[in-house]
Structure formats: structure tokens, C-alpha cells
């Protein structure tokens, strides 16, 4: 009996961190009708990647044209609009903020950065179209705006398009999300970063991970969406995972990770953690799947707009049902 009890204790102690990290048992919210429009998502991605390309820090005119496009969609959705200055030399750089629902009380924030990266290849400066990174996230944000116009949320919702996430601003006070997070006066229930939600690959071996052992828990095919948060964001990750699972045909995996796991803080949600705000990232896992990350091959034709629409449907389900 003692040996059995000891074995059970060892199994429990081994399994508990695994369950917390992986969260295998999350019940989906009831399914909802499909709302998001894949054609509109593609239209937004193509505008951002073709008409106003490149959207890098050294192309301020294109960034401002992108901001105006985003602002126009927010205005047409009936939101209360704020343009927030991001104090960077050579600007203006602006976050575009859209508020829906009650003007006071707790907020849910959904954010996505609209800038794109540049890089050097063979000592030559090149610009990525940034379809997945992060026109896909912005397209999701604007589709949420259109859907919030159709049904006003019962809780305060703030959609934020950030001007500066990519290098040289990443992990600095000049990130658009750092400026926004520091400016908040209302309590925040949850922040969600939409960071690369458009690239999917069902080929075996198409999904990589920071550590090889993670392939024991997660698929080797990159055909799922991921929800990522800190260990202390367990409830937030479960909430977002449950709402994404309400999109019936979307595979969803989650991770509550310790700080040293590479990639868990590679987007705008990291700045809300600095203010003790529950924040998660919805992502296709970026360069662990999309080999055109920050490269000229990150183009609109490589994205799956049906799956993007399913992600948006999951998020709007959360917003429609929040009180």
C-alpha cells in the first residue's frame, strides 16, 4: 500500500505542472453562428501589405496612411476614437484607440500592432510585406470593430492598433503598447494581443517549438491557433481558450509558461504584464511555424482567411458574452 501511495504521489507531482502548463481540459463555450467575413479580412491584409507597403519605422508616411485606414474603420463602427501620440523622434507615430460599451468600469483590451519589420539580407535592407506579422492581427482587430458595431458589448471594450512594436522599438518604452499600458486609468479585466493569426500548415513536421520535448505535448503540424500566457494568467488563458474552442473547426492549444520559455513575451501583451494586468497572446506561433517571418515572402497569398475568421469568431464570442 505504501508503495502504491508513493507512486501515486510521484505521478501527481509530475502531472500537476504538466496540467497547469498544457491545460488539456478546457470546455468550449457553446458554439455561435459564424460572424467574421474572410473576404473582408483578406481585403484588409492586401491593403496593408500592398497599398501601404512597407510599414516599417523608417516609412512614416505609410504608417500614417495605415493609421488613417484603421481610424476610418473604427469611426464607421460607431466607436469613440482617440489618437494617442507615441513619443518617438521622427514621428508622428500614433496608437489608434476605439472604445465600445460603457464609458467607465472594467475594460477588455484587444490589441494588434500595425507596423512591419525590416531586415538586412546580404547587406541589403529589405522590407517584409508583413502579411502574417502583423496585418493578420490588424485585420482581425478591424473585423472585431465591424462586429461590435452590430452588437454593443455589455462591458467596456477597447480595440487598440499600436504604431510601434517591431525593432528598433521592441522591449523599449517606445513600443506603442508600452505607452498605452502606462496611460490606463480604468481597471482592466483582460488584455489580448492578436499577434500573427493567419498562417497555417498541415504538413507533418511544419511546427517547431523552443524545446524538442514540447513536441511530446503539442502537434507537429502547424494547423492550430495558440493561446499563450504566464503561469499567473491561468484563468485568462482558460477563458480565451474556451471561447476560441467555440469555433467548431478551429484547433486550439494553450500554454501557461514560465518566464524563460522563448517566445511567450514576443508581442505587445508583455507591456501589460508590467502593470499586473492579465494578458495573453493569440498567435499562430510566428517563426516556430512561418519560415517567412520578417522576410519578403510574408505575403497575403500565404494566409488562411477561413481560419482567421474562426479566430475572430472566437474572440467576438468572448466580447458578446462578457458582463
Show which residues each predicted segment covers:
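Hydrophobic membrane-insertion alpha-helices, especially the h-region
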Residues: 5-21
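N-terminal capping segment at the start of a domain
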Residues: 18-65, 77, 288-298
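Second-shell loop/turn segments in exported
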Residues: 29-36, 51-61, 82-87, 123-134, ...
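Extracytoplasmic/secreted proteins, especially bacterial periplasmic and envelope-associated proteins
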Residues: 40-43, 47, 61, 65-76, ...
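A non-catalytic alpha/beta surface segment that caps or lines the substrate-entry region
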Residues: 47-103, 253-255
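Solvent-exposed loop/turn segments at secondary-structure junctions
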Residues: 87-89, 102-104, 114-118, 164-168, ...
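Acidic/histidine-rich catalytic neighborhood of metal-dependent amide-processing enzymes
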Residues: 128-232, 261-264
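Active-site-adjacent substrate-binding region
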Residues: 190, 202-323
